[in-house]
């Protein structure tokens, strides 16, 4: 393939499709993590392209915390049904029994039990040897130094000092029993690339990414959208309608909205062209402590 004749987005697309096909050919039991966000939507679109006109040769896995936005759950189920995908949903039963939630137990414990431990449970339960994720290197500093094929030991831990070289687009998927590889086909994409590709390919996304009047309150420097009644207002807090959208999606008590008037994809792209802040500025879990994302990844987080 003549790379010089491909546009920037088509080069990224070709690289990602190559990675997805490589994993499908190399591993015996891969899975695609599906977090319902924009990156997951792009990754799923690329996977469908990679195996068209056939169906996906692996299932989708959603590790559910019980605290995603309602619109995310609706979108997840509708998308899986529309594309004929096998969708696996796992929720940490111990966490559910303990009543773990972000308001009572805080973001760090909630993330560890419901996300990290939940993910490890699901990977062990189904015996997956490779798991696709939609993380990108431009998102956060620990992700910037992670390989496309990210080796995990039998406890699902990541060691940034023990990464494999990836020369000339050759990936080392050699593993022993119990070990696994996390695979990031979107590693070299930026947030702007994602939005331009969504626009180019007309990929459906969760409506929360588009600006609309939504009920929010200010707490701990974050605009929290109130998605259900599982919240106790603190003294002085007032819920008000504001024109907001989300740059990243997660559990609604831990994901801050941004004030915006961007109601269309071209308007979002225009915003991205002048933005000087990270999309993860609204993610509470990234503020738990210095280097919190790397610590989470060392423990088995995606």
UniProtKB/Swiss-Prot annotation:
It catalyses: sulfate + ATP + H(+) = adenosine 5'-phosphosulfate + diphosphate. It comes from the Bacteria. Pathway: Sulfur metabolism; hydrogen sulfide biosynthesis; sulfite from sulfate: step 1/3. The keyword rRNA-binding does not apply. InterPro entries: PAPS_reduct_dom (IPR002500), Rossmann-like_a/b/a_fold (IPR014729), SO4_adenylTrfase_ssu (IPR011784), Sulfate_adenylyltrnsfr_sub2 (IPR050128). Pfam families: PAPS_reduct. The keyword rRNA processing does not apply. Its EC number is 2.7.7.4. It is an enzyme of class 2 (transferase). PANTHER family: SULFATE ADENYLYLTRANSFERASE SUBUNIT 2. Belongs to the PAPS reductase family. CysD subfamily. Heterodimer composed of CysD, the smaller subunit, and CysN. With CysN forms the ATP sulfurylase (ATPS) that catalyzes the adenylation of sulfate producing adenosine 5'-phosphosulfate (APS) and diphosphate, the first enzymatic step in sulfur assimilation pathway. APS synthesis involves the formation of a high-energy phosphoric-sulfuric acid anhydride bond driven by GTP hydrolysis by CysN coupled to ATP hydrolysis by CysD. This is Sulfate adenylyltransferase subunit 2. The gene is cysD.
